[in-house]
Curated annotation (Swiss-Prot):
UniProt-recorded Gene Ontology molecular function terms: ATP binding; metal ion binding; protein folding chaperone; protein-folding chaperone binding; unfolded protein binding
Disulphides: none
NCBIfam families the record matches: PRK00364.1-1 (NF001526)
Keyword Magnesium: no
Annotated gene: groES2
Function, as annotated: Together with the chaperonin GroEL, plays an essential role in assisting protein folding. The GroEL-GroES system forms a nano-cage that allows encapsulation of the non-native substrate proteins and provides a physical environment optimized to promote and accelerate protein folding. GroES binds to the apical surface of the GroEL ring, thereby capping the opening of the GroEL channel.
Organism of derivation: Vibrio vulnificus (strain YJ016)
GO BP term (any one): chaperone cofactor-dependent protein refolding
Alphabetical keyword list: Chaperone, Cytoplasm
Similarity-based family: Belongs to the GroES chaperonin family.
Keyword Chaperone: yes
Classification via InterPro entries: Chaperonin_GroES, Chaperonin_GroES_sf, Chaprnonin_Cpn10_CS, GroES-like_sf
Example of a GO cellular component annotation carried by this entry: cytoplasm
Name under which the protein is recorded: Co-chaperonin GroES 2
Subunit structure: Heptamer of 7 subunits arranged in a ring. Interacts with the chaperonin GroEL.
């Protein structure tokens, strides 16, 4: 199944968090919080402006981003993987 985001939406594959502490202790799944970092696998064309044009997207496919994992972030399962659907405004930073 393919998914194509609309407007300023992004499809992000969440990156896994290391399950070891700095001291080398393996942490249980309950004590490891979900990562708020992921790789953009698809991006919309940009938000439509009042004049009919589209605002350009700063975030591009392939970027690794840090995002606000809160209200408005949707989770979708496809082909056994979990993807996030979020707005470009939910992205806090691009990791370079």
């Amino acid at each position: 199944m393919n998914i194509r985001p609309l407007n300023d939406k992004l499809i992000v594959e969440r990156q896994e968090v290391e399950n070891k502490s700095e001291g080398g202790i393996v942490l249980t799944s309950q004590s490891v919080k979900k990562s708020n970092r992921g790789k953009v696998i698809a991006a919309g064309l940009g938000k439509r402006l009042e004049n009919g044009e589209r605002a350009s997207m700063e975030v591009k496919v392939g970027d690794v981003v840090i995002f606000n994992d809160g209200y408005g972030v949707k989770t979708e399962k496809m082909d056994g993987k979990e993807y996030l659907i979020l707005s470009e405004s939910d992205v806090l930073a691009i990791v370079e």
